[in-house]
Amino acid sequence: MVYGPHTQADRERMLATLGLDSVERLFDDIPPAVRAAGLDLPAPRSELELVRELQALAARNRVDLVSFLGAGVYRHHIPASVDAVISRGEFATAYTPYQPEISQGTLQTVFEFQSLIAELVGLPVVSASHYDGATATAEAALMAVRATRRQRVLISRAVHRHAVEATRTYVTSPSRDLAELPTLEDGSTDLAALEAALADPEHPVAAVIIGQPNAFGILEPMARAAELAHAAGALFVAVVEPVSLAVLAPPGEYGADIAAGDGQPLGIAPAYGGPSVGLLACSEALMRQIPGRLVGRTTDLDGRRAFVMTLRAREQDIRRDKAASNICTNQALCALAATTYLATLGPHGLGDVAATGAAMARRLEDALAGIGVQRVHGGAYLSELAVTVPGARDVHGALLERGILAGFELARWYPDDPRLRDALLLSCTELTTTPPPRRPIPSERPCPSPRAPRRAAGCRRRS
């Protein structure tokens, strides 16, 4: 196939075949009033001139900011091994590994991704990846609807708003609905409201969806919420932040049937909100309901270890109306980045990342309290906290001029909540390298310690 541009002789030959005397005649059907009069393109540049112009544009980017921005997308140190691995030509491809005999490397990396995420969340079945945390959460809701044959989903108001809206889009129909659960003064989900909603005999619930930590950074009573959901015959879905699982209990430990989350913190740099990788895991009882791809390990005819795609319940493989998902792709390269990141850090390294972010958040809270800035919510948190700052938008802009990215304005997500009108959500990670003046961390608010590595069912232990 020739990729060279058409020559003038080529164009004249095609126009002659069409019976036209100019290219402009091809657009005669477009009314002149809406037709472009011409393209105001700059003069051609040499490669050197173009590089200099792009460098000048790139120099306008602010990369020297002290950032407290999180709200679902987080800046972490990314080991050099991550880019080294994902840049290899064997992996940087759009090819789907349908032919296992020539795709063992790609299939093995997906299997390793599934194994590592299974160990992290404490659930045995993990999909090969999804677009992002929002679509993974929405798919979890549909899994629950199919498994329970119920038509109502309850989701906490404190789940990330992107996940809430994606789930609403997926779930809502004339026969199904999504209801939001309110939050308490401490920022956690109102379990009394949850219990009342579950007790409604007219609207049996398929799933209860709660985030850990939630969108305010608050730690939720997940075990109790799971207990209430199961008592009413509903499934419990935990929406998790993966780095936090190095120090918090995994979803499988407190009874979650499904875990969803966004894998961006695992070795993927923030870039205008993407790319990312959706995490979705479930119990063995729900294995047939999980959408997307699964990679399994088997043996070939010669008895050698082999990796293959298995249990493919996608619309490309079975009848569309029976398919578990109509998503026809995944985020394999981003999943490989997450795999490399986790393998490089190991459980204790990941625990250090989570614990450092938590310690920095407590130092930030103490420093802000010293100048009269208080938290919005009183609940326990890990490394993200909401604070009240009168005139938050103006303060945010003023600090940005001074090289400080002062978090996320929660009023953008909750415009009708007066408590959040002047609230900034501040996040700390190990890259919060310019901390406020240090104060002793009170003993009643200790920084979490990394939890001991756990081995999920069907997964190999990692060192």
Where are these regions (language model features)?
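Gly-rich Lys/Arg/Thr-decorated short loops/hinges at beta-loop-alpha junctions or inter-strand turns
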Residues: 88-100, 116-123, 148-149, 171-181, ...
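PLP-dependent enzyme catalytic core of the Aspartate aminotransferase-like
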Residues: 10-16, 115, 416-452, 460-463
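N-terminal entrance/gating region of PLP-dependent enzymes' catalytic architecture
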Residues: 36-112, 318
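Compact, charge-rich alpha-helical regulatory domains located at protein termini
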Residues: 1-36
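Active-site C-terminal subdomain of aminotransferase-like
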Residues: 266-371, 375-378
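Short loop-beta-helix segment that forms the pyridoxal 5′-phosphate
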Residues: 98-102, 106, 119-138
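Conserved PLP-enzyme active-site core in the AAT-like
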Residues: 2, 14, 135-306, 372, ...
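Conserved C-terminal alpha-helix-loop-beta "cap" of PLP-dependent enzymes
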Residues: 348-435
